[in-house]
Amino acid sequence: MSAPLEHHTPMMAQYLALKGGYPETLLFYRMGDFYELFYADAEKAARLLNITLTQRGQSGGQTVVMAGVPFHALENYLTRLIKLGESVAIAEQVGEVGAAKGPLERKVVRVITPGTLTDTELLSDKAESLLLSLHQAARARCGLAWLSVTQGRVHLAECAHDELGAWLARVAPSEIIYSAGVTQRFEQQLQALRQSGAFDCPMRTRPDWQFDQALGERKLLEHLGAASLQAWDAQDLGAAQAAAAGLLAYAEHTQGRALTHVHSVQAQRGDELIDLPGSTRRNLELVKTLRGDDAPTLLSLLDNCMTGMGSRLLKTWLLEPHRERHQARQRLSASTALRGAAAGAGPWATLREQIKGASDVERITARIALRQVRPRELPGLVKTLQKAQLLAQHGQIPEPYLMQIFDQLHPPEGCAELLQAAIAEEPAALVREGGVIATGFDAELDELRALQTDCDGFLLDLETREKARTGIANLRVQFNKVHGFYIEVTSSNLERVPADYRRRQTLKNAERFITPELKAFEDKALSANERALVREKWLYEQILDRLQPHVPALTRLAQALATLDVLCTLAERSLTLNWCAPQFVSEPCIEIEGGRHPVVEARLAETASGSFIANHTRLNANTRMQLITGPNMGGKSTYMRQVALIVLLASIGSHVPASSCRLGPIDAIHTRIGAADDLANAQSTFMLEMTEAAHILHAATAHSLVLMDEIGRGTSTFDGLALASGIATHLHDKTRAFTLFATHYFELTDLPAKARHAINMHVSATESGADIVFLHEIQPGPASRSYGIQVAKLAGMPPPVLHHARRTLAALEERAGAGQLQVDLFAAPKEEPESKSASPVEAALAGINPDALSPREALDALYQLKRMAGK
């Protein structure tokens, strides 16, 4: 508000002072049983939450606009706001009533943002809440740092500006922060990336001074307890360290304390992971279907994990496969050992049964470190620690990776015992409600509780004595939270009330009194209750203090338990779905016998729609490209996707849906499959297709797998054919990537005659009268025809349309048979003339750095170039 604080009422002055620290955040201000919002916050909340907007009184010469929500329904409203990308600051009453003049003391106790969630009610069991920080560095470089507050690991990376979109799509943050000092061009790039779909989350600016490289390095070293970042291969990531400074400052700001549970840093290099662009993740339906649903996807098929932390880890494995095979071999060896020699013979089933029901140790540990853990989470943690101790006894399984995991499952000494002794078996939801600390843990608390327990006996005894003394048979001695203890007498018996009865409350048909004896007991009992609650709160804080040294060990245990959960799940899935172990080799190849599409096969089994037709794939040094032709609905896209999914599954260390699989080095999986117009960004299907194809041609290498499906649609036949042939030739001759190239242009089947590493394949179909039967088999050679009219018939096309189409097709085929000059689509293009040495203008232009010029310098440079060009 514009008026100075001294012109406002004391309460509104307090509110505005708090709000000043959180100008871009909705402030929930606790008032009794409600959280109130005022002024612009109230108007925004009323609109977003559909709650009532009211006006009440004036402050600072203006009407106070307000809206509120009940305190007991807070989590519901927070969930809705977070899903809308909003952030919320919670201001609680921290002072005692009557302790000071003026309004009750309040302070902001936590800030809830989409990227820093820790509350169980706000988090999805199977998804992380990720905060990502960006730092614009020199030479068109960018530093990235991100973390999940509940996980406690900081990730660092650096990239060129033109690679930022790919990194944001890979990380998929829930919230992005960046320095307020970035250039306008960088900010425009971020907005363009969000519009393009590279990410979809709120962005916020933070003070420029927080993004300091030296500060970031110091903070990271403090968290690691180390003198150098060299052991984490992060010593040379200065831009990422600057991003980490902003990241940790913001995360600490939202949690209201240091992140003491952050003990791990992971530096990620662009060449460490198999590249899975956003189009690949989308087209292969890894975690979302093309319609945006969670199932059926590859993740939904794989995820039979028993814990939420296992599900989250499996998703990370799936989206971050490593190029180097050591990790995949490790996981594959472990899951194979868990499988045993045959179904039911391995230890996976026993282990999964023991893991079942385990608490989310990862998130509980983070909340312990942040002192936000709820009492009801702790008994579950005790049971999980006991489960972990039993699981650790399986360490005799003779498999190196599993032995490491079991070794980390031993609970920290004394942790479970402390919690078992200190926390009630069924504690209250909140400490302030009492009943959290177990009986017998603290003698003083037990004594205070005994006073409360004796209350019922005293009241019954007093009621008996007062009935005898007054002769009032229906006299009652009772208690409520508003009026305390009282003796209730009906109106018809008021003449019998003794002189020492003092009136406390008048009702319609009765009066309530208190006596000196009852008043003395009330003071003692209520005091005991208040003191017991204070004692419980103090004891709970002491317990959290004693748990802090166990946080690192609990974090390691959580990671081990999640890893074991995923490995057992992969073992179970491989047995249930009849998958085989892939073989990793050094020579370049993708050789699959009896490959199946895992999701399609599972859907067929669920719906009893028949069995999946397996197919072989052989790509190696001699055959790097398959040109696939055949009718629509024949299975071309399914075949191509299944090859990519098998490669991906093998790369994460899973068994694969095939009879056998040999896989060489892979650095990326690129896909160009299907499209729809991007109306929001004014891009047609054809433009999207060409954009994605261009990206693939620039990014793919000889170790990449490329899927190209029906490239060239959306323009004229000749244009599409020419482009398709050019793209296929480039992939074969220049890129030399492993390529599955499905096409409806039969002219492209001439390519293998001139390209030594390409072969024709087709999806088989057969005619039965006027109908078509799809065999879904991939066979050598080109397709003989496309069966488009038969497919149209299956789709329900009206008979007159089909009749017209058949006559037109016959005429076109007859005309084509008359013979015309055949254009050689695959003739080597004429060499482009060698580029001449750069002209003076070009040399001068190449030496200009537009980002380093002031507007005046840019104008001077332009005139200089103009003069040079005119000579």
UniProtKB/Swiss-Prot annotation:
GO molecular function: ATP binding; ATP-dependent DNA damage sensor activity; damaged DNA binding; mismatched DNA binding
Residues reported to bind ATP: 630-637
Region (Disordered): 830-849
Top-level taxonomy: Bacteria, Pseudomonadati, Pseudomonadota, Betaproteobacteria, Burkholderiales
Described function: This protein is involved in the repair of mismatches in DNA. It is possible that it carries out the mismatch recognition step. This protein has a weak ATPase activity.
Gene transcribed to yield this protein: mutS
Organism of derivation: Verminephrobacter eiseniae (strain EF01-2)
Name of the protein: DNA mismatch repair protein MutS
GO biological process: mismatch repair
Pfam families in the cross-refs: MutS_I, MutS_II, MutS_III, MutS_IV, MutS_V
Gene3D superfamilies: 1.10.1420.10, 6.10.140.430, DNA repair protein MutS, domain I (3.40.1170.10), MutS, connector domain (3.30.420.110), P-loop containing nucleotide triphosphate hydrolases (3.40.50.300)
